[in-house]
Amino acid sequence: MRSSSWRKSDQRVFIEQVRECMNNGYLLSSKKIGSGAFSKVYLAYATRERMKHNPRLSSDLRGKRHTMVAIKIVSMAEAPAEYSRKFLPREILSLNATYKHMNIVQLYETYQNSQRSYLVLELAARGDLLEHINAVSDLRCCPGLEEEEARRLFWQLVSAVAHCHNVGIVHRDLKCENILLDDQGFIKLTDFGFANWVGLKNSLLSTFCGSVAYTAPEILMSKKYNGEQADLWSLGIILHAMVSGKLPFKEHQPHRMLNLIRRGPIFRPGLSPECRDLIRGLLQLHPCERLDLQQVAAHCWMLPAEHMLSSALGAPREQDHSWSTVAPDNTEPDRDTRHARSKGSSSSSGRTSPRRPSLAQLCNTWKPAPEQ
């Protein structure tokens, strides 16, 4: 009896959502393509009328030759007040700040009422990176992706993260499940709910974010941390998962995870020395000893994927004043704390080369502006 009443309630809510989407120019399908604690993501279709009035939407969908989008519906009744006040606005603002990068999921528009918020997003139809790694591993009868494919995908991911950092955004929840693939196999970084704006490069944060398996050791130790360096640790975990088919450290308890981290990653036989060196460089226990994005871009393992780049690095950080309405994580409850970053030199001669591409080349891998 109770389950029947729940089904009727769900049907009523879905009908309301269909009506609200229709009123805003979208045909909501019943196909659910994702879900979170208090949100669901559905496949939807943009109407011709909506595309006429939304240049961002029409320019992107023209290139894709379809009208499909993903609509994320957040239940404001189920979401905690902190999520509605802090995390949802950060997600929206970070997606707006990173608009046009080809490896970051595009936000076309938002609308809301007292009960729900709707985010109209670019559709990435081939699932997430974790699903892709598992599917390829099954086909190959060997764990992980081949290094050439891992290199191609990792280039795109590094490009997306470099662009985020260049506009002052740290993601803080980088993991395989938050990296989607579109129908052409391109990476689409998503889920910016924990993203934060850092006005100064060496600002320190203190909020524990993300999944333990991808979380930097300084965060596990409850220390204040540099968000960019924490993102770099997560990149190392993701690369290891790509080429090995499994996470390098897996424990639910932070103190046990730290013990595994101190022992260092274990690599599968046959993995190239260059790839091992890059992963070790990213998974340094001490944040200041970790490779930065400039060094990642210049690493010898990355060189064969140079064709993925498009323009120039070392560009000055762009300031996005739209973030001024959202308090950075280190203002509440944290105090504004900064440190001078001392970057150690790389221990491996294979890691850097002055002839390799610079970071601006990574940051600028975005889509051209739509034609007017």
From Swiss-Prot:
Q: Which top-level enzyme class is recorded in the Swiss-Prot or TrEMBL entry?
A: transferase
**Domain of life of the native organism:** Eukaryota
Query: What post-translational modification information does the record give?
Result: Autophosphorylated.
- Cofactor(s) annotated in UniProt: Mg(2+)
Q: Which GO terms describe its biological process?
A: cell differentiation; protein phosphorylation; spermatogenesis
Q: InterPro entries this protein is in?
A: Kinase-like_dom_sf (IPR011009), Prot_kinase_dom (IPR000719), Ser/Thr_kinase_AS (IPR008271)
User: Is Nucleus found in the keyword set?
Assistant: no
Enzyme Commission code(s) on record: 2.7.11.1
Activity regulation comment: Activated by phosphorylation on Thr-207, potentially by autophosphorylation.
Gene3D superfamilies of this UniProt entry? Transferase(Phosphotransferase) domain 1 (1.10.510.10)
Q: Which UniProt keywords apply?
A: ATP-binding, Developmental protein, Differentiation, Kinase, Magnesium, Metal-binding, Nucleotide-binding, Phosphoprotein, Serine/threonine-protein kinase, Spermatogenesis, Transferase
The keyword Nucleotide-binding belongs to this UniProt entry's keyword annotation: yes
Protein name per the record: Testis-specific serine/threonine-protein kinase 5
The gene name on file is: Tssk5
